[in-house]
């Protein structure tokens, strides 16, 4: 369906959206009916839901900086591996968390479904059990 170069461009732009601090910029990478579930939790649905999810991360880590570590793709399926750093807003402790998202892209190369993963126990440990 897609060439790896185009997928890499999308991943770089998605990373820039997270680094902009704008929940709406993050949400624009999703289909209007897209969704994301993190660590098998309840999914956020639609762009408004995606923006709400991103806003939660920005609230917890206002100086969040995201790096795309690697991208793998096969057809319309993408693995986006990332690391974010920043300072937890409540405890003021530094964070460095790695994880990944598994994307299913639609025909317009928007994320239809994302399954996100990171070690929540490690996050809690670094944040000081905030």
Name each region found by the language model.
Residues 11-15:
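N-terminal hydrophobic signal/anchor transmembrane helix of membrane proteins
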Residues 1-6, 16-19, 37, 51-130:
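A beta-strand edge to alpha-helix "cap/lid" segment located at domain peripheries
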Residues 29, 33-45, 56-60:
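A short gly/proline-enriched turn/hairpin at secondary-structure junctions
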């Amino acid at each position: 369906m897609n060439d790896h170069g185009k997928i890499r461009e999308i991943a770089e732009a998605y990373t820039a959206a997270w680094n902009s601090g704008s929940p709406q910029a993050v949400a624009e990478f999703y289909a209007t009916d897209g969704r994301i579930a993190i660590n098998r939790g309840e999914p956020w649905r639609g762009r408004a839901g995606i923006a709400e999810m991103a806003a939660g991360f920005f609230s917890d880590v206002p100086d969040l900086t995201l790096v795309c570590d690697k991208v793998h793709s096969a057809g319309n399926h993408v693995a986006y591996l990332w690391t974010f750093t920043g300072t937890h807003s409540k405890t003021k402790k530094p964070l460095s968390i790695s994880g990944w998202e598994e994307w299913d892209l639609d025909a317009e190369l928007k994320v239809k479904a994302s399954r996100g993963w990171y070690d929540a126990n490690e996050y809690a440990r670094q944040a000081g059990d905030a």
